[in-house]
A protein has these predicted regions:
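Active-site nucleotide/adenylate-binding loops and adjacent lid/helix of ATP-dependent enzymes
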Residues: 98-140
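ATP-binding N-terminal substructure of ATP-dependent carboxylate-amine bond-forming enzymes
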Residues: 1-100, 104
Length: 140
């Protein structure tokens, strides 16, 4: 059986932990990150530093891996979609698009009958004032 190469987009703490866990399973990891000093650089087998919209580097990354995942939600949707044409990306880019928008994410979860905290969309300061019953609360 040939060695598995896992591509991880993002090089933070989760990328570091994923690389460490993969190593225990004899899975090679290649990190793609826009931070040249990312913590995961110290734990992976290969590291590609580039902006997330650098098509040349994205293709270089895809050639080196068998499957791709990402460690945080702020990867551009277009980048993940392009990668998904080249190699399997998990979670799918459509999931990434959903989790980038907190209101859409909450609405989706509630449609699955999974309870979340109460929430409301506020578009202006005037809409905030009558919402005293939501306090204390978090404004995002």
């Amino acid at each position: 059986m040939s060695e598995i190469k896992l591509g991880i987009i993002g090089g933070g703490q989760l990328g570091s932990m994923l690389s460490e866990a993969a190593r225990k399973l004899n899975i090679k990891t290649i990190i793609y990150c826009d931070d040249p000093n990312a913590p995961a650089k110290n734990f992976c087998d290969d590291f590609i530093y580039a902006e997330y919209n650098n098509k040349e580097k994205i293709y270089e990354f895809a050639k080196k891996v068998d499957v791709i995942t990402y460690e945080f939600e702020n990867i551009p949707f277009d980048t993940l979609s392009e990668l998904n044409k080249l190699k399997p990306v998990s979670p799918k880019p459509s999931v990434n698009r959903l989790i980038q928008h907190r209101l859409a994410e909450k609405d989706f979860i509630n449609k699955l009958n999974i309870r979340t905290t109460r929430y409301v969309l506020i578009k202006s300061k005037e809409e905030l004032l009558p919402l005293e019953d939501f306090l204390p609360g978090i404004l995002k």
